Structures are given as structure tokens and as C-alpha cells.
Curated annotation (Swiss-Prot):
Protein name: Adenylate kinase
Binding sites annotated in the UniProt record for Zn(2+): 130, 133, 150, 153
Amino acids binding AMP: 31, 36, 57-59, 85-88, 92, 160, 171
Gene expressing this chain: adk
EC number: 2.7.4.3
PROSITE patterns tied to this protein: ADENYLATE_KINASE (PS00113)
GO function terms (MF aspect): adenylate kinase activity; ATP binding; zinc ion binding
This protein's domain notes: Consists of three domains, a large central CORE domain and two small peripheral domains, NMPbind and LID, which undergo movements during catalysis. The LID domain closes over the site of phosphoryl transfer upon ATP binding. Assembling and dissambling the active center during each catalytic cycle provides an effective means to prevent ATP hydrolysis. Some bacteria have evolved a zinc-coordinating structure that stabilizes the LID domain.
Superkingdom as given in the UniProt entry: Bacteria
Length: 217
């Protein structure tokens, strides 16, 4: 089984990726983790990407594609995984199609988590994180027992720069320009399943598992 998760920033892809990978017993492959691994190990690609980022430039598709391909080639033995954070545009999707074809792999489903801008904004700006343990709260939906304080280690909660309204809107603009066209790309391939990402976690998971089970029949 191979799944791809798509959705705007703040929709909860990472949370669903963790839940689904545990239930389905498949690997959760997050692009951010692959980048950090290459940085930490000072690989040739990792060093190159660091230089590009240091110049304030975007990492070219061909370099990102190569990093993903290298990782998947080493981890291909299981042939069961979930991609979170890749592809980000149609060119990357076409590269991935070719990679799957050459590796005799078959994409099971693309899950697209949809939501309106205002709903996303409300979710994002209310998010708070513990700088010590990383636990995520929301001032309305998942509040700590004591306002502004982590339940676990009593540290003062913070709001990430990415979660501030002006930063979020910039990230959303990039998503709409680059990643949103992927929805139509995969819809035309009859591989897309769209789900309301603003439902609670259990509801979203249930809907995804149901459509995957239907596809198996």
C-alpha cells in the first residue's frame, strides 16, 4: 500500500499520517525528516541544499526529487509507505510517477484534506506548543489545564512563527499556487479521495479507512 497525503498548512496531515501509519502498519515518510537526516549526516545532497537555503533560494525540484528517490530506494523493501510532504507540485508528481513505474510500485490512493481559509486560520492561530516536550495544544479545541502552561512539564507555551496569521497566509498562498494543482492532477488519474479536514481526527481517520477498504474489494 502506498498513500500520498495532500492538504494546506495547518490541516493536520502530520497527525493523520501518524495515526494511519500506526493502524495500517506502514512507514510514515515525511519529507522534512528526510531533509533533516541528510543535514545531520552531512550527505552530498544535504550539504548542497544547506548552501542553497543559506543563499535564500528555493531548493530546485531535481535536487528534492533525487533526495526522495535515494531514500525510497533504500527503504523500498517494504513497499508499504505513506508520503507526507511530497510531491509539492505537478513536476514532482510526474517524477514520482516515473519512479514508481521503474520500481514496479503502485500508488494506492491520494488523500486530500480540504478546508476553507477562515477555518484554517482559526485552527492555526489558536495553536500553542510546548518548547520543552513539543506537545501541541489549541486555546479552544485542546486547551491545557492551566492557560498558557504545558500540562506535562509546566513550561510556558509558545506560538510558532509559522502559526502567526501573516506567516500562515504566505504559506497558504504558496500552497494554492504550487500544490493545489496536484488535486486536479490526481483527480484526473482517478486516484484522489477528498475529505473534510476540519472534522475531528477520529472522523477523518474513519472515512479514510473506509475508502481504502472499499478499494481493496
Amino acid at each position: 500500500m502506498i498513500l500520498i497525503l495532500l492538504g494546506p498548512p495547518g490541516i493536520g496531515k502530520g497527525t493523520q499520517a501518524s495515526v494511519l501509519s500506526d493502524i495500517l502498519k506502514i512507514n510514515h515518510i515525511a519529507t522534512g525528516d528526510i531533509f533533516r537526516k541528510n543535514f545531520k549526516e552531512n550527505t552530498e545532497l544535504g550539504i548542497l541544499i544547506k548552501k542553497i537555503i543559506a543563499q535564500g533560494l528555493l531548493v530546485p525540484d531535481d535536487i528534492t526529487n533525487q533526495m526522495i528517490a535515494d531514500y525510497l530506494s533504500k527503504d523500498i523493501a517494504t513497499k508499504d509507505f505513506l508520503l507526507d510532504g511530497f510531491p509539492r507540485n505537478v513536476l514532482q508528481a510526474r517524477f514520482l510517477d516515473d519512479f514508481f513505474k521503474n520500481s514496479h510500485l503502485f500508488l494506492t490512493k491520494v488523500i486530500y484534506f480540504n478546508a476553507g481559509t477562515q477555518d484554517l486560520m482559526k485552527r492555526i492561530v489558536g495553536r500553542r506548543i510546548c518548547p520543552e516536550c513539543g506537545k501541541v495544544y489549541h486555546i479552544e479545541n485542546i486547551p491545557p489545564k492551566t492557560p498558557g502552561i504545558c500540562d506535562k512539564d509546566q513550561k510556558t507555551l509558545i506560538q510558532r512563527e509559522d502559526d502567526k496569521p501573516e506567516t500562515f497566509l504566505k504559506r497558504l498562498k504558496v500552497f494554492n499556487q504550487e500544490t493545489l494543482p496536484l488535486v486536479q492532477y490526481y483527480r484526473e488519474q482517478n486516484q484522489l479521495f477528498e475529505v473534510d479536514g476540519m472534522q475531528n481526527i477520529d472522523q477523518v481517520t474513519k472515512m479514510i479507512l473506509e475508502v481504502l477498504e472499499t478499494d481493496r474489494k
